[in-house]
């Protein structure tokens, strides 16, 4: 099966983010910025993915995004996310202006608060994020080029009212449904979802746990999962099988496509897939295997 015929999913030009030259498409690639090269970005573009999301706190000077934009012609580059505790908003706004001048309509700035456990300055993140958005927009970053990392209803509301939308991380489709209810019909909703190409469930879960497990020690993620009904038993250790199955799509390309489509059915506009492989493995063959099942090539 392919995803292309599975649902209508087009709210069209009523969406402010959709009226720009930027087109994300239904599926993009999420990958840690340190693992992305210009050659990989060009390969992702050739396969038909609409966006490349630079994860794990890419630098706010946006130099890498600019380099990747130079290496591609149509791919949207996005940050997921610039950490507001690590980069001053005035500097990020100036960097955004530089990138926008050189590559108009192809860059989406994702910002957020990161994790309490990883950031010494982390305090009152909602108020700090709202102020950060104030400074970015005063510095010329337009609302339709700004998205926020958001999990709970308060920050989702900020993403609805002050930005183009939200980019939730480590969420099942049930969260997407709740997030769309908070955002309403207009704003962009682009959740991240992990993927393992392996038809052996035990092996797939084992590989998925290598990426999920560290996040189960982070309060923002566990609090969000508890809001969704997951229990302490699910969240203990490296996560229950049911939790891993909800957070990591695995199986054949067709089976994975069906799992990712649940986000679209729940109200997402775009899904950022994070392919998990053995350390050091080239992800491009996996992207190539997934693209036809996702209706991309």
What annotation goes with each model-predicted range?
Residues 2-297:
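Active-site-adjacent structural elements that line small-molecule/cofactor binding pockets in enzymes
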């Amino acid at each position: 099966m392919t995803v292309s015929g599975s649902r209508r999913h087009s709210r069209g030009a009523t969406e402010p983010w959709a009226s720009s030259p930027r087109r994300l498409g239904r599926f993009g690639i999420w990958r840690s910025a340190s693992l992305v090269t210009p050659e990989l970005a060009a390969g992702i573009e050739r396969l038909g993915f609409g966006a490349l999301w630079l994860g794990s706190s890419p630098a706010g000077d946006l130099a890498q995004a600019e380099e990747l934009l130079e290496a591609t012609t149509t791919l949207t580059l996005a940050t997921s996310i610039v950490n507001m505790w690590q980069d001053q908003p005035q500097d990020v706004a100036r960097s955004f202006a530089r990138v926008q001048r050189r590559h108009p309509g192809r860059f989406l700035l994702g910002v957020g608060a990161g994790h309490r456990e990883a950031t010494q300055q982390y305090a009152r993140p909602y108020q700090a994020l709202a102020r950060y958005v104030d400074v970015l927009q005063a510095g010329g970053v337009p609302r339709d080029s700004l998205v926020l990392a958001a999990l709970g209803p308060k920050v989702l509301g900020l993403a609805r009212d002050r930005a183009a939308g939200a980019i939730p991380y480590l969420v099942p489709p049930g969260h997407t449904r709740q997030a769309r209810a908070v955002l309403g019909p207009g704003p962009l909703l682009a959740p991240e979802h992990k993927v393992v190409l392996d038809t052996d469930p035990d092996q797939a879960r084992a590989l998925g746990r290598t990426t999920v497990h560290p996040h189960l020690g982070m309060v923002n993620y566990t609090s969000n999962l508890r809001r969704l009904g997951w229990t302490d038993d699910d969240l203990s250790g490296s996560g229950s099988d049911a939790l891993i199955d909800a957070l990591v799509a695995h199986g054949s390309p067709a089976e994975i496509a069906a799992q990712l489509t649940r986000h679209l059915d729940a109200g997402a506009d775009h899904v950022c897939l994070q392919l998990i492989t053995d350390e050091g493995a080239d992800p491009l063959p996996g992207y190539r295997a997934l693209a036809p099942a996702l209706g991309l090539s």
